[in-house]
């Protein structure tokens, strides 16, 4: 898949330099070409953008190499060498820790003006041990929509939603009030847990908070009893513990509110639903449940410096990938929610803009080092679905269950922050 970069003389010269321990001079990259690697959807769209406008960095051309799948792209990076690797790779935030450790990725220092185009949490996603390794590209998140044939205006609080459900459950034959259509009852439902006052971990100024518990069991239990349970401690049906059938029920008009994924928005648009996207509202007006809103990134590699194009590669990251114009040009083809704030107000689809704004308003990073659990604990992915089942199906005491979950979360946070 990679472009041949050297003739026989060039290879011999490079080998001699490597053996002698000398550093290759800038003239090493005589063609002034920046190579970008991407997957089967991002690659062709980036190529179209650069074919339309190729002068993002003076004195450099951009070559996009496309791989057959995201997995194939990751395998190629794993097998890349100084002669074959890219200068920039468009990949997952989860690649950053490994790439930083094995030296395939290189850190980049960005000005405060560039950083202001994104959220602090976006950069947390692309950081390891305090260093940033790329530029946020697009967001992977969920958000809530409401059926305008049932609900005439956006709810301001979770209580507004519950009240609507209770008042219209029988007359409109509603099967639930809010359900998870995209992302499941762990990843997709974090915003519901957060709207009720809990969290897998807390963030402040782009950092994990370690001196405050992620859950206050008393407060969470009180809110669950107020908004999800009846006087006898049984579920009102407003929020089901399972995501089974949610999407079909929402599309059929039997559920007024649904959390959907940004990968499936076309399904709803084709059925006539408006993309009135928003985070799940919290207990108080103006507060919102936080959803996981991790970003993919355009990542700088160490190969760029070895080939003498690091300056150009860094400029491309800033002038194209981190710019409003670049984000708009790219996302108008890619149709993913942009991470760059300026592009979130552009003339893109309502879904792209809506998901992007929801993530900016209430997105937190998906931190695997914390969420995946640690020795003597359990993973968030197992804990939250089990919690919903315990309090909404099995009738267990919300405070007791919240206390147990909080204790596991604290163990996961304490262990996870050591590898960030």
What are these regions (language model features)?
Residues 207-240:
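Glycine-centered hinge/linker elements that transmit conformational signals in sensory
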Residues 331-382, 418-420:
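Long, aromatic- and glycine/proline-rich binding clefts that accommodate carbohydrate-like moieties
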Residues 86-87, 115-149, 287-291, 366-374:
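A structural signal for short loop-to-beta-strand junctions that line the ligand-binding cleft
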Residues 93-141, 153-154, 158-160, 278:
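Hinge/lid segment of periplasmic solute-binding proteins
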Residues 364-420:
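Conserved C-terminal helix/tail region of periplasmic/extracytoplasmic solute-binding proteins
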Residues 2-4, 8-21, 25-95, 400, ...:
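Conserved N-terminal structural module of periplasmic/extracytoplasmic solute-binding proteins
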Residues 133-137, 142, 162-211, 255:
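Extracytoplasmic/periplasmic solute-binding protein
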Residues 130, 270-334:
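Extracytoplasmic/periplasmic substrate-recognition and gating elements
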């Amino acid at each position: 898949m990679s472009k041949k970069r050297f003739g026989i003389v060039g290879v011999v010269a490079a080998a001699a330099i490597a053996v002698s321990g000398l550093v290759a001079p800038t003239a090493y990259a005589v063609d002034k070409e920046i190579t970008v690697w991407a997957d089967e959807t991002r690659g062709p769209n980036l190529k179209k953008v650069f074919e339309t406008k190729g002068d993002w960095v003076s004195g450099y051309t951009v070559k996009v190499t496309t791989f057959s799948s995201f997995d194939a792209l990751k395998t190629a990076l794993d097998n890349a060498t100084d002669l074959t690797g890219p200068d920039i790779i468009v990949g997952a935030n989860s690649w950053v820790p490994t790439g930083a450790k094995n030296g395939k990725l290189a850190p980049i220092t960005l000005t405060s003006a560039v950083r202001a185009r994104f959220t602090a949490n976006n950069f947390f996603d692309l950081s390891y041990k305090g260093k940033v390794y790329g530029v946020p590209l697009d967001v992977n998140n969920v958000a809530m929509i409401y059926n305008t044939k049932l609900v005439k205006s956006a709810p301001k609080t979770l209580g507004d939603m519950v009240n609507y459900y209770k008042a219209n459950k029988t007359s409109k034959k509603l099967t639930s009030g809010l359900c998870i259509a995209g992302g499941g009852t762990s990843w997709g439902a974090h915003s519901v847990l957060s709207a009720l006052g809990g969290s897998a971990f807390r963030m402040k100024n782009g950092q994990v908070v370690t001196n405050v518990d992620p859950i206050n069991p008393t407060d969470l239990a009180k809110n669950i009893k107020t908004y999800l349970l009846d006087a006898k401690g049984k579920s009102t049906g407003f929020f089901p513990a399972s995501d089974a059938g949610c999407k079909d029920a929402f599309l059929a008009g039997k559920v007024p509110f649904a959390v959907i994924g940004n990968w499936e928005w076309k399904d709803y648009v084709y059925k006539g639903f408006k993309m009135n996207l928003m985070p799940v509202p919290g207990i108080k007006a103006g507060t919102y449940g936080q959803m996981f809103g991790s970003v993919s990134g355009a990542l700088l590699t160490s190969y760029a410096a070895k080939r003498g194009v690091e300056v150009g590669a860094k400029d491309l990251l800033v002038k194209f990938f981190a710019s409003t114009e670049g984000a708009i040009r790219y996302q108008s083809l890619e149709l993913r929610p942009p991470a760059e704030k300026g592009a979130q107000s552009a003339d893109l689809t309502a879904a792209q803009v809506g998901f992007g704004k929801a993530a900016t308003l209430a997105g937190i990073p998906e931190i695997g080092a914390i969420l995946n659990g640690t020795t003597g604990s359990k993973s968030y992915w197992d804990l939250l679905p089990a919690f919903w089942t315990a309090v909404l199906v099995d009738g267990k005491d919300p405070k007791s269950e919240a206390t147990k979950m909080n204790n596991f979360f604290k163990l996961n946070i304490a262990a996870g922050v050591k590898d960030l």
